[in-house]
């Protein structure tokens, strides 16, 4: 029972981290956003986030871009 509780807690926290944009997955959004600084939008966002690790910044930038894209082009 204790092991199950630990596993469920880990899955919950992992899902929350993915939702919030933390870099817990190695490839995160590599299929939807070009490598860091090769994409002008990612580069501009990441340069403004001084002091944050590149992995976090990359994930955050990709999630932000995807969110804006989905809001802008959502079919009604």
Swiss-Prot record:
GO terms for molecular function: sodium channel regulator activity; toxin activity. Expressed by the venom gland. SUPFAM superfamilies: Scorpion toxin-like (SSF57095). This is Putative sodium channel toxin Ts36. It comes from the Eukaryota. Contains 3 disulfide bonds. Residues 1-17 form the signal peptide. Belongs to the long (3 C-C) scorpion toxin superfamily. Sodium channel inhibitor family. It comes from Tityus serrulatus. Keywords: Disulfide bond, Ion channel impairing toxin, Neurotoxin, Secreted, Signal, Toxin, Voltage-gated sodium channel impairing toxin. One of its GO terms (cellular component) is extracellular region. It is found in: Secreted. Putative sodium channel toxin.
